[in-house]
Amino acid sequence: SLGVRKVIFIPDKYLAQNIAKETDIEIITWDNGSCEVHELFTPEDLIEARDSVDNLKIIAHPECPPNVISEADFSGSTAKMIEWVSENKPDKVMMVTECSMSDNISAENPDVEFIRPCNLCPHMKKITLPKILDNLLYLNNEVKIDPVIAKKAFHAVDRMIKLDIS
């Protein structure tokens, strides 16, 4: 527990809604924020997949809409989905998230058949190892924040970093 009754949660409205369902915390969110990949999934997609694939387990990223999460067998962060597959070793699994995630996890779980509903993220595809190296070497995309804004934000950011959620 965070020891608070109300939290401002941005930028993803679906993640905020899913967290609100799991906690007793009032969550204030920004209605325009969502992941374009995760919001493309519908409950009907999951129902259709389950009807057409025997013994299918469905795991969904919590940035999916709540009605999609309610059709899944498990919902968790990317790390939690990886952990779930490794621990449960389902015969067949559909990961309701960006499709390259299944590609990454399938290499470590060759006995699991991955059903891939493929929604590609155009933004994630822009990230490449050469671009990361270039940015680390030359700091090409440095973000500069107005000192007045930085000072106002410092205490909130510092509290988030120090927060013990274990």
Task: Name every feature range the model reports, one short phrase each.
Residues S1-S166:
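The feature marks the mature, well-folded catalytic cores of soluble enzymes
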